[in-house]
């Protein structure tokens, strides 16, 4: 059974993002029930527009038992704190993206230790691939995308930008109550 409120939200989201015409033939996209979901399909060529989540990679970077966070310089959640993340470019691996984002957003070089997990939910437009890493060089600093970058003790974290940030940190510190042991393992 299709939930009309979900349908309305879906339609508004696509209208706001400008997806109204077929990328194949430029015909109009109209909502249809396809595979038991409301999807947009072309009225001229029957192309189906699948709204797929974008892959994003990030890193929980540690140094001296502290966690690197960046203060977001853009919406959503401007001014709140999160860890370095970014969209995975074609030709890049998730691991390369995580390392690149730490450098771009926080001015640090990171050696990845391991994959922590893959995160998403039903209303999310991204699939987030998160690594644990060790800061091997650089001093945290802000940039155009990040107002600030700092190291925080696990017990003294600022307000985080997203609910999933808390889940992800719980996964890290639940498995590794002492973040320094990750760093020692790496040396």
Predicted regions span which residues?
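N-terminal leader/linker segments that precede catalytic domains of diphosphate-processing enzymes
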Residues: 1-76, 87-104, 108-137, 180-187
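A short local loop/turn or secondary-structure capping micro-motif enriched for an aromatic residue
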Residues: 76-79, 150
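Conserved acetyl-CoA binding element of GNAT-fold acetyltransferases
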Residues: 80-86
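Short aromatic/basic micro-patch
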Residues: 82, 109, 151
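Short glycine-enriched loop/turn motifs at secondary-structure junctions
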Residues: 82, 123, 143-145
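NUDIX/MutT-family hydrolases
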Residues: 142-172
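C-terminal terminal-structure detector
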Residues: 175-177
């Amino acid at each position: 059974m299709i939930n009309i409120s979900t349908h309305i939200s879906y339609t508004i989201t696509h209208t706001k993002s400008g997806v109204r015409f077929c990328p194949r033939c430029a015909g109009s996209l109209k909502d249809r029930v396809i595979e038991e979901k409301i999807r947009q399909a072309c009225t001229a060529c029957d192309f189906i527009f699948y709204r797929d989540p974008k892959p994003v990679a990030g890193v929980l970077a540690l140094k001296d038992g502290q966690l690197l966070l960046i203060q977001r310089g853009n919406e959503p959640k401007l001014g709140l704190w999160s860890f370095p993340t970014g969209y995975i470019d074609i030709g890049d691996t998730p691991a390369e993206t995580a390392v690149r984002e730490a450098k771009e957003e926080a001015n640090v070089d990171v050696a990845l230790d391991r994959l922590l997990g893959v995160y998403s939910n039903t209303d999310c437009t991204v699939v987030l691939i998160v690594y644990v890493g060790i800061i091997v060089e650089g001093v945290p600093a802000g940039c155009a995308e990040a107002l600030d970058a700092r190291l925080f003790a696990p017990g003294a974290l600022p307000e985080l930008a997203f609910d999933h940030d808390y889940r992800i940190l719980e996964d890290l510190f639940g498995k590794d109550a002492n973040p320094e042991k990750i760093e020692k393992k790496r040396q």
